[in-house]
C-alpha cells in the first residue's frame, strides 16, 4: 500500500498572519512529500507490511525489518506527525483569543491548574527541545494528560502515548518567517490551534 500526501484542509495562505504562505507551501508540498516518498521507497520491497496502517507501523517499531526500521521510524514518523499537524491548525484571521474549551479545556485545567500553566509548560517543552523535534500534549496509558517532547520525527505512539496536540519545532517549520526566534513561532501557534480537533482526539484517547 503506497502512502500519499494529504491535502491541506485550508488554503496555504489561510493561516496568515501567523504562519506565512511560503512556509506552508514548502513545509507541506516539499518536506512532507519527501517523508511520504521516502517511506514508500523503504517499504516497497516488504509485502508483509502492505496491510499495516501508518499508526501500526510506528506503534511497534521492533516488528519492522531491521534493514528499514530507521527509515520507517524517521519517514513514517514524519508522515504521521505532519498529517496530524495540519489538522491541529485552523485559520484565525482576526487574531482573536484562542483557548482550550470543552472537555479538553476542563481536563487541562484539572491536570495543570490552568490553561496558562499548561501553555507555559508546553512552550518550555517546545523551546527546550535541542535541535529538531516536536512538543506534544499526550494522553498516557492511565488516561492522564502530559506534556512531552520528542527528537527528530519520533511520534509518542511508539512510547505507548496518544498525542492529542503537537507542534513541529524543526527549523523548516518557522525559519522563513521567524528566523531563529523559536519562541515567537510557538506563541503564534497558539493563535491557530484547532481545539475542536483536540477535543475529538481526547475523547477517543482518554
Curated annotation (Swiss-Prot):
Enzyme nomenclature, EC number: 1.15.1.1
Please share the entry's free-text remark on the cofactor: Binds 1 Mn(2+) ion per subunit.
Query: Pfam families, per this entry?
Result: Sod_Fe_C, Sod_Fe_N
Cofactor(s) this protein requires: Mn(2+)
Q: Name one GO cellular component term.
A: cytoplasm
Cell membrane recorded as keyword: no
Source organism, top-level taxon: Bacteria
Keywords carried by this UniProt record: Manganese, Metal-binding, Oxidoreductase
Q: Which catalysed reactions does the entry list for this protein?
A: 2 superoxide + 2 H(+) = H2O2 + O2
Q: Which SUPFAM superfamilies match?
A: Fe,Mn superoxide dismutase (SOD), C-terminal domain (SSF54719), Fe,Mn superoxide dismutase (SOD), N-terminal domain (SSF46609)
| GO molecular function term, any single one | metal ion binding
- The positions annotated for binding Mn(2+) are 27, 82, 168, 172
Going by the record, the broad EC class of this enzyme is: oxidoreductase
This molecule's function is given as:
Destroys superoxide anion radicals which are normally produced within the cells and which are toxic to biological systems.
Family to which the UniProt record says this protein belongs: Belongs to the iron/manganese superoxide dismutase family.
PANTHER family, A to Z? 37S RIBOSOMAL PROTEIN S26, MITOCHONDRIAL, SMALL RIBOSOMAL SUBUNIT PROTEIN MS42
**Name of protein:** Superoxide dismutase [Mn]
- Gene symbol? sodA
Amino acid at each position: 500500500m503506497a502512502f500519499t500526501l494529504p491535502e491541506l484542509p485550508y488554503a496555504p495562505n489561510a493561516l496568515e498572519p501567523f504562519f506565512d504562505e511560503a512556509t506552508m507551501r514548502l513545509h507541506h508540498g516539499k518536506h512532507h512529500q519527501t517523508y511520504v516518498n521516502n517511506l514508500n521507497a523503504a517499504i516497497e520491497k516488504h509485502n508483509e507490511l502492505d496491510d499495516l496502517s501508518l499508526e501500526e507501523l510506528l506503534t511497534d517499531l521492533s516488528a519492522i525489518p531491521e534493514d528499514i526500521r530507521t527509515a520507517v521510524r524517521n519517514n513514517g514518523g514524519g508522515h504521521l506527525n505532519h498529517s496530524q499537524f495540519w489538522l491541529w491548525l485552523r485559520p484565525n484571521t482576526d487574531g482573536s483569543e484562542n483557548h482550550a474549551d470543552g472537555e479538553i479545556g476542563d481536563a487541562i485545567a484539572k491536570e495543570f491548574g490552568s490553561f496558562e500553566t499548561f501553555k507555559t509548560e508546553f512552550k518550555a517543552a517546545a523551546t527546550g527541545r535541542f535541535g529538531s523535534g516536536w512538543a506534544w500534549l499526550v494522553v498516557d496509558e492511565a488516561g492522564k494528560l502530559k506534556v512531552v517532547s520528542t527528537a527528530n520525527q519520533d511520534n509518542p505512539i511508539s512510547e505507548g502515548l496518544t498525542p492529542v496536540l503537537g507542534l513541529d519545532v524543526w527549523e523548516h517549520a518557522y525559519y522563513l518567517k521567524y528566523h531563529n526566534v523559536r519562541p515567537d513561532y510557538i506563541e503564534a501557534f497558539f493563535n491557530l490551534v484547532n481545539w475542536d480537533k483536540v477535543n475529538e482526539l481526547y475523547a477517543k484517547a482518554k
